[in-house]
């Protein structure tokens, strides 16, 4: 296996449970990338893509406004343009409805899937059942999102829309901050994503799994099979090979014969360490498109979309925006210090992850491209990949996620 984020670790544990001997190879070790720095939400209702109608007309204004959560490293634009044209093609109602149908299958039982994955590993303690809130500054802002909430309702998501006096019962920490709060039921969170995945990986090793920290250089092929992964620490042979490399999947996917428009969508977080008060539940602040999550000993604010590739250094502007938003939302909270982080979301042009077998090779499977819902969908994706390898029939329509049939 290549890649030790949530998808890779989940796949490895489920394969181990099915009786396979597994090697997990990652250049930095478990949970060293996006799986560490995400917002920690198990968001079964995250079935609306970024590419919604109106995105094309709104984007230029957002890029020119440093208070909006969209950023671009302009030197990267020539390389980005081919992907961007394909990506923006999907900013239409038909695709949003198709995306919601596909992702509802993958995400609806995310909390149960994580609990099943963590059972008996010692990682159970990191999983919490929580409501997930969406906060709107104005009723007009909420009404602009009405289509998304109607679509969630259509897919049987349970939520309450609160206004007026009802807002006082949600969380005192947000009193006066919002005119509308939507309370999503049947959600959850991981209170420390990095430690959660490391604990899962520790269980994997304790049960005779092997984790190898190495850079993957290529692979060895014989006929229609990959028989070994070439790394800077030697060649590792295998009967089956699975790639779950997240944002580092783009170049590799081409070598696997896949035609996937693919980019890294850069995201940021800051953390308020040892805050004097804690929110009860995580909340998406709609105006700034960032998520506030109470975690072990800190409040994490995660969000922002920046296109700039995998190699560029972190930008100051997204971090400063998150700090500004934190100061506005939590003006009365004291904390010891602030930490900062940059990560990469693996993004396909149609925003759907790729899950399944690769036609070019008889023994290769992939699982990547979850964009904003990698943690939410990662446990189930790993289970699906393990079931496919073991020739079981997953209880999901996988045609939406076919890596060979990208349209």
Place the predicted regions along the sequence by residue.
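Glycine-rich FAD pyrophosphate-binding loop
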Residues: 17-37
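Rossmann-like flavin
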Residues: 81-202
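Active-site substrate-recognition segment that forms the wall
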Residues: 18, 40-41, 46-90, 218-226, ...
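A conserved short coil-to-beta-strand element within the FAD-binding core of flavoproteins
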Residues: 162-171, 189, 210-227
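N-terminal Rossmann-like FAD-binding beta1-loop-alpha1 element of flavoenzymes
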Residues: 1-24
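C-terminal catalytic lobe of FAD-dependent flavoproteins
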Residues: 159, 287, 328-407
